[in-house]
């Protein structure tokens, strides 16, 4: 949840409890018939962001092939399928890769004028619309299908889809780290996100089954639980204990907690 979303809830008298339930990695993958991509987070953001800096100004991204960004990358057209703007996976990817991985690290991007306030964030988070990045809808299985049809294309989706299709797909190494269960769980893989649920206090004791719903998270979020089998990366035992306590006590979410 973003601070402005919590502020909106507070203005409307809505009290919430935030409960972390696990982790998910975001991968860029391709067919095993193609070239395994080994790329830095900065170069990946540079390949996909709509605008790049040139002489202190922002221009339309001119790069057509991966190796134009870095000679170590494949001499192939940049063609990446991914989720639309309505997707949480898309929102996390552009924040972690385009904004924090590229704009915040690249010396030319840092030097270029970005405007005030969130104009900087919006510019960095915008994805290309010239065919290098192709929106493929909310269904990740459609992206998987595209990748199996085109070995030179890459796709962006959650780790669970890579895990479920590991017989035909391979995950790119980002900043020298492969997207594996172990690397995501240990926070070594940098393109990952925490997963949360939010409990509205006004629903407690009113919505039938809410208490049981929360208890079921505790029963199923361990390494041996069904959520792990479905692709969610479990929290450490210490974190599970912390959020199990939160389910029992339901502390009110505040701006300080979000920081």
Task: Mark where each language-model region is.
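Flexible loop/hinge segments at secondary-structure junctions
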Residues: 1-259
